[in-house]
UniProtKB/Swiss-Prot annotation:
Disulfide bonds: none annotated. The keyword Acetylation applies. Transmembrane segments: none annotated. The keyword Transmembrane does not apply. The lineage of its organism: Bacteria, Bacillati, Actinomycetota, Actinomycetes, Mycobacteriales. One of its GO terms (molecular function) is dGTPase activity. GO terms for cellular component: plasma membrane. Residues 1-36 are annotated as: Disordered. Pfam families: HD (PF01966), HD_assoc (PF13286). This is Deoxyguanosinetriphosphate triphosphohydrolase-like protein. PANTHER family: DEOXYGUANOSINETRIPHOSPHATE TRIPHOSPHOHYDROLASE, DEOXYNUCLEOSIDE TRIPHOSPHATE TRIPHOSPHOHYDROLASE. It comes from Mycobacterium tuberculosis (strain ATCC 25618 / H37Rv). Residues 72-222 form the HD domain. The modification N-acetylserine is found at S2.
Amino acid sequence: MSASEHDPYDDFDRQRRVAEAPKTAGLPGTEGQYRSDFARDRARVLHSAALRRLADKTQVVGPREGDTPRTRLTHSLEVAQIGRGMAIGLGCDLDLVELAGLAHDIGHPPYGHNGERALDEVAASHGGFEGNAQNFRILTSLEPKVVDAQGLSAGLNLTRASLDAVTKYPWMRGDGLGSQRRKFGFYDDDRESAVWVRQGAPPERACLEAQVMDWADDVAYSVHDVEDGVVSERIDLRVLAAEEDAAALARLGEREFSRVSADELMAAARRLSRLPVVAAVGKYDATLSASVALKRLTSELVGRFASAAIATTRAAAGPGPLVRFRADLQVPDLVRAEVAVLKILALQFIMSDPRHLETQARQRERIHRVAHRLYSGAPQTLDPVYAAAFNTAADDAARLRVVVDQIASYTEGRLERIDADQLGVSRNALD
């Protein structure tokens, strides 16, 4: 079926790489396809073990810190919800965008971006590690659901459009323009699957659904990281109205976000400080009124940033369903600057805290220790699926990739138990 105004996606978008046999366990008279292909894909991600493991993986602070932790899983749920709301305004398939939000961090290792850094060091001589490329690897091979005619895993066997919607960086390390970028979306090992997904797509251009997911991710973590910082009393939003403090934040932001000038960031800080919902938070004291004010702040900022992208994109692209490569997401520069200010607040007052940096250093050391132990003792030190892959790996690079895949799959609790067993100490001694 070709695309139409009623259904802007076509059979090419809905194609799966491996043909699947019909289900056989249904009761007589109940056969039928009641869900769309993208709804089925969303369900596959939602029920995956890889998604559940995100409950014990760090977003900014550890999943066991505080009474209301934000984990990679809760963050992914928030991204999915924001993306779904944007999809309504743009005419994208709701299940497709929600799926992209759920899966956008599914390849994250223990300790989030800090764990990414450590695994990239471990695999530096053999293709490195990148969370976005690991997302794709999990969805197309590591998460068990479907096997091909040769008995090889096809991962969740998602549709082409679903896999593309999860792909923020549609290039491989060292390919074309991607060679000048730190982030990439595919490992060379997964080139064949990547070529299949990107067949007919404009080179190095993410589809609209992936762009929506990417902006929803930016909005979610910038707003919610600041919310967590306020609750933990690490961030005081009154700094936005203090010229000297705001100027220092703007200078830091100019260094971190080279595409946004200090003047733009100062102007953004002033705009944010003058919003009634920001002023209402004031000095947070955890009372009912303060908690309500903070929740209203997060709600209104998410709405501000998401609706600006919808309206600007609609103004540029016109009416009708906007899907795949029919449009690019348009976000006003002043809104990007406001989101950048929130990111700088989290960077300055949470991620640059000396205690946080010390914890991160210990986490990286732990990953290096466990990687050395697993590789030197493989295949006996590996889980059965990974041990089999290690035994059939063609060379040292492929064997190291298997070890990295296993570590990336660990929850933080499991990684710490393995490290504690190796050192012969209690887990508490490692904190």
